[in-house]
């Protein structure tokens, strides 16, 4: 990738500074899509600008005009700033000033509006490119109001005058965060650290089954944290069976899992995290309000608590970080008789025979650990598994889960009927109906099966309908997610969004956390850094974990052409599985996707193995640094580990090849 020097031609470096890099196309918007888990989202189909313009320790020689760093600081800390290049633009500057002065109100008005000082800052054309790249505004001269990029005169005039007048007044808070998930909390604490007055609103509407939870969002309460703990509990069950092969003498009798004990342990841990977040907010002097926030004006929020008491709050800026909630299909009986991942981890009874509906990572992960506890589990899918992920890897996961003892049904439920009602001590019993092709006649016929628990995991949707975004004109996509110019609303410049609720953004907890912190530094401290939304390592915590980073086979071929892609792969056998004779050993697999005409630059890697997340995280940095296959070849592996297989790949994947067989230690 090109460096910023190559891209903008404006920087002179002090000696021995690290070379930074920039996106291949700085004009491509990174705007927008388990709030969710640090696992399970495919790499984005259209990567955002990949590299931050931040150059640590950089000296910017930028004349004429003030240095870029100073200019951005002024924009962040002044009420009104206009950036321009030359005296040729002075006429436009006068037009800005004239328009703003037209908003003045008479001195005898109830709250007379005074127009603050308008700072006109001259910057070089090179700095102009950087500022426009940071804001994704093409207009010039470019105006900032209270640290928010507005755009040019056209964009300024497009704002309602009443909104603009109110924007220039003082408000109670510098920032109100709506949503107390991982991203919202990170942003609130970072803004407070930068000296801003911050409030954070968080309120969880109960699921149709009545489940709610505390501060921390999806990941902590009903996503990655409880999911990973239950995944680990499932793996421990297999380790107990393996222990005999390793010489451990176990008590006679059947080893059984106790659902209630695990559930209570998981919920105790979550409760400690909920309390910890409240303590952190207090220590950071962030005002925590356990109320549901809704816009009632451009700079006003109505905060309604569980007692229906309403409090009005005002702020200069707002951050939407409300995340996602599970979707429910319009099928008779679904909302009455099914649960989602919102309910599973607090389920008061043992799930029993379970149907997981959906091909998402949530469905497969939950199916995996429930089967590991000894439950009869079926996964019902409409079409392909793990849409958006590498489909070769998805098929390998399906084959492993079938070998593991799970069942797969192709279809979609048409209705669900209750047979026995559930209680707090016992699961109910339900009959699920769906159409299935008769193998003898070829005709579709209705079939049914009884289950104790039905888990719906068909996808998630943004929590934006009841936040009042339409009241103030925040533009949303068809997905209900906020459309943004980076994290800034495309239509209301004092409203921002991060995390799962931002269109086009990977739905991953670490992404939301980093986006929140980086955004706060940019708008409150003038930092010239951006969140990098590409080449994000991720893991699906199925029984045999799937880790990946970069492009799938399908996306690599679509982007670069089939003839320019070379794929190295192998099947391997973890040493730990040899003595225990695990069936998993024939399913462990990895591959590396490279570009033929770019010295075999690595554009994606995928691995199906125990502890795939730990392996993927480490190798992810190689893609960020544009590593080539030869770099992996030169790296000496740690023996015996599964990770060392990335350093010994020699087999090229070709169409028509027979399935690989694992052999020897670690491959």
Curated annotation (Swiss-Prot):
Its main location: cytoplasm. It comes from the Eukaryota. The active site is a redox-active disulfide bond. There is a cross-link at residues 665-666 (Cysteinyl-selenocysteine (Cys-Sec)). GO terms for biological process: cell redox homeostasis; ecdysis, collagen and cuticulin-based cuticle. PROSITE patterns: PYRIDINE_REDOX_1. This is Thioredoxin reductase 1. It is found in: Cytoplasm. It catalyses: [thioredoxin]-dithiol + NADP(+) = [thioredoxin]-disulfide + NADPH + H(+). FAD binds at residues 202-219. GO terms for molecular function: flavin adenine dinucleotide binding; thioredoxin-disulfide reductase (NADPH) activity. GO terms for cellular component: cytoplasm; cytosol; mitochondrion. Binds 1 FAD per subunit. Its cofactor is FAD.
């Amino acid at each position: 990738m090109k460096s910023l020097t190559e891209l903008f031609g404006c920087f002179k470096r002090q000696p021995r500074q690290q070379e930074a890099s920039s996106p291949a196309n700085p004009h491509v918007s990174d705007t927008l899509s388990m709030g969710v888990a640090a696992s399970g989202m495919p790499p984005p189909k259209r990567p955002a600008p990949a590299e931050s313009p931040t150059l640590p320790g950089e000296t910017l020689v930028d004349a004429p005009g003030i240095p870029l760093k100073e200019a951005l600081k002024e924009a962040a800390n002044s009420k009104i700033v206009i950036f321009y290049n030359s005296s040729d633009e002075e006429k436009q500057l006068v037009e800005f000033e004239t328009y703003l002065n037209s908003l003045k109100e008479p001195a005898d008005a109830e709250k007379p509006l005074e127009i603050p000082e308008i700072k006109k800052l001259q910057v070089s054309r090179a700095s102009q490119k950087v500022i426009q790249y940071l804001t994704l505004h093409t207009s010039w001269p470019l105006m900032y109001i209270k640290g928010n990029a507005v755009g040019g005169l056209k964009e300024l005039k497009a704002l309602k005058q009443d909104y603009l007048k109110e924007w220039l007044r003082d408000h109670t808070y510098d920032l109100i965060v709506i949503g107390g998930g991982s991203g919202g909390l990170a942003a609130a604490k970072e803004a407070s650290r930068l000296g801003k007055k911050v409030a954070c609103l968080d309120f969880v509407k109960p699921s149709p089954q009545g489940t709610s939870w505390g501060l921390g969002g999806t990941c902590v309460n009903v996503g990655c944290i409880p999911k990973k703990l239950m995944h680990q509990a499932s793996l421990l069950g297999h380790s107990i069976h393996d222990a005999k092969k390793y010489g451990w003498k176990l008590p006679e009798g059947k080893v059984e899992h106790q659902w209630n004990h695990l559930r209570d342990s998981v919920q105790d841990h979550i409760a400690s995290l909920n309390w910890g977040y409240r303590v952190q907010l207090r220590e950071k002097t962030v005002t925590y309000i356990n109320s549901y926030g809704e816009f009632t004006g451009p700079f006003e929020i109505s905060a309604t608590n569980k007692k229906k008491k309403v409090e009005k709050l005002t702020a200069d800026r707002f951050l939407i970080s409300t995340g996602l909630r599970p979707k429910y299909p319009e099928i008779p009986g679904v909302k009455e008789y099914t649960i989602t991942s919102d309910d599973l981890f607090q389920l008061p009874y043992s799930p029993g025979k379970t149907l997981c509906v959906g091909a998402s990572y949530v469905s497969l992960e939950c199916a995996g650990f429930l089967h590991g506890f000894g439950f009869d589990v079926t996964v019902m899918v409409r079409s392909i598994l793990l849409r958006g992920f590498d489909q070769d890897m998805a098929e390998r996961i399906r084959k492993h889960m079938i070998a593991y003892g799970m069942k797969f049904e192709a279809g979609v439920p048409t209705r669900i009927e209750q047979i026995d009602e559930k209680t707090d001590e016992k699961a109910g019993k339900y009959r699920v109906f769906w159409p299935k092709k008769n193998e003898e006649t070829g005709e579709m016929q209705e079939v049914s099966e009884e289950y104790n628990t039905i888990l719906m995991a068909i996808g998630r949707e943004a929590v934006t309908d009841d936040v009042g975004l339409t009241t103030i004109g925040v533009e949303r996509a068809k997905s209900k997610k906020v459309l943004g110019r980076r994290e800034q609303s495309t239509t209301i410049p004092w409203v921002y969004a991060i995390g799962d609720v931002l269109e086009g953004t990977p739905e991953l907890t670490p992404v939301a956390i980093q986006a929140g912190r980086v955004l706060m530094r940019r708008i409150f401290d003038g930092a010239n850094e951006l969140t990098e939304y590409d080449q994000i390592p991720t893991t699906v915590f199925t029984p045999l974990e799937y880790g990946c980073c970069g492009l799938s086979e399908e996306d690599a071929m679509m982007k670069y052409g089939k003839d320019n892609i070379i794929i190295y792969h192998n099947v391997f056998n973890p040493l730990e599985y040899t003595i225990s004779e695990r069936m998993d050993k024939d399913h462990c697999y990895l591959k590396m996707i490279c570009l033929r005409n770019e010295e075999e630059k690595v554009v994606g890697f995928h691995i199906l193995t125990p502890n795939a997340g730990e392996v993927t995280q480490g190798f992810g940095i190689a893609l960020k640094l544009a590593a080539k296959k030869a770099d992996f070849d030169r790296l000496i592996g740690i023996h015996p580990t599964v990770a060392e297989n990335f350093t010994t790949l020699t087999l090229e994947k070709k169409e028509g090849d027979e399935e690989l067989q694992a052999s020897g230690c670690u491959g």
